[in-house]
């Protein structure tokens, strides 16, 4: 599933392609993706004539800011956007097409059909699900070591599970939680409330450093991820633990271990992380 670095990269690359374009028509081939409004025909009607003014992101959600509405899109496992000429053939698994007035169209493709779209009156999107109860943004001024300490101290869950909770901090998934915990030398199965203040301070910086580096490298292309211009990310080449089960730790030479924490595959070094 695309995490913060991947969604942020999609936001940036799509912004270069679609800002200023006006939607003339919307075609929906898989109605179950449209979660709001309930009526797909209304979804299409409301978007007609709307111009994309800016692109935003909230956690793992992509936001299209239009004249009067905000389209909130979640890519889920394998969703992707791409800009095409209208006369180009439509690929299999293309489920939503936003047809513009300049001969181009934005296509949403999703092999597994897990992606979702919600349309809100501008300004309402932050007040209602799926955005209303999301936690702090890692790159915001509100995300401090003190805040992270307070939130982790209030949960009895393991640190890996706590960091995956989008109500605590948004944008982190399996990849970047594993990587940040490795950099902070914290074992993923430790209880969050038992992590010391000093350790949380290191973890806070590890989260920021990991996400910043990943964004700068366009995210991680583990499976099918590409950005809005069809380009792969490069951060997968720097992964220390994620996806490296059995390979040697770059710090100590111990084979990387994979276990399951909270139902999620988890990679770590049994020597470096305590």
Swiss-Prot record:
Its EC number is 3.2.2.23, 4.2.99.18. Keywords: DNA damage, DNA repair, DNA-binding, Glycosidase, Hydrolase, Lyase, Metal-binding, Multifunctional enzyme, Zinc, Zinc-finger. Involved in base excision repair of DNA damaged by oxidation or by mutagenic agents. Acts as a DNA glycosylase that recognizes and removes damaged bases. Has a preference for oxidized purines, such as 7,8-dihydro-8-oxoguanine (8-oxoG). Has AP (apurinic/apyrimidinic) lyase activity and introduces nicks in the DNA strand. Cleaves the DNA backbone by beta-delta elimination to generate a single-strand break at the site of the removed base with both 3'- and 5'-phosphates. One of its GO terms (biological process) is base-excision repair. Binds 1 zinc ion per subunit. This is Formamidopyrimidine-DNA glycosylase. A zinc finger (FPG-type) spans 240-274. DNA binds at residues 93, 112. It catalyses: Hydrolysis of DNA containing ring-opened 7-methylguanine residues, releasing 2,6-diamino-4-hydroxy-5-(N-methyl)formamidopyrimidine; 2'-deoxyribonucleotide-(2'-deoxyribose 5'-phosphate)-2'-deoxyribonucleotide-DNA = a 3'-end 2'-deoxyribonucleotide-(2,3-dehydro-2,3-deoxyribose 5'-phosphate)-DNA + a 5'-end 5'-phospho-2'-deoxyribonucleoside-DNA + H(+). Its cofactor is Zn(2+). Belongs to the FPG family. InterPro entries: DNA_glyclase/AP_lyase_DNA-bd, DNA_glyclase_Znf_dom_DNA_BS, Formamido-pyr_DNA_Glyclase, FPG_cat, MutM-like_N-ter, Ribosomal_uS13-like_H2TH, Znf_DNA_glyclase/AP_lyase, Znf_FPG/IleRS. NCBIfam families: fpg, PRK01103.1. The gene is mutM. It comes from Halalkalibacterium halodurans (strain ATCC BAA-125 / DSM 18197 / FERM 7344 / JCM 9153 / C-125) (Bacillus halodurans). Monomer. The keyword Lyase applies. GO terms for molecular function: 8-oxo-7,8-dihydroguanine DNA N-glycosylase activity; class I DNA-(apurinic or apyrimidinic site) endonuclease activity; damaged DNA binding; zinc ion binding. The active site is at residues 2-3, 60, 264. PANTHER family: FORMAMIDOPYRIMIDINE-DNA GLYCOSYLASE.
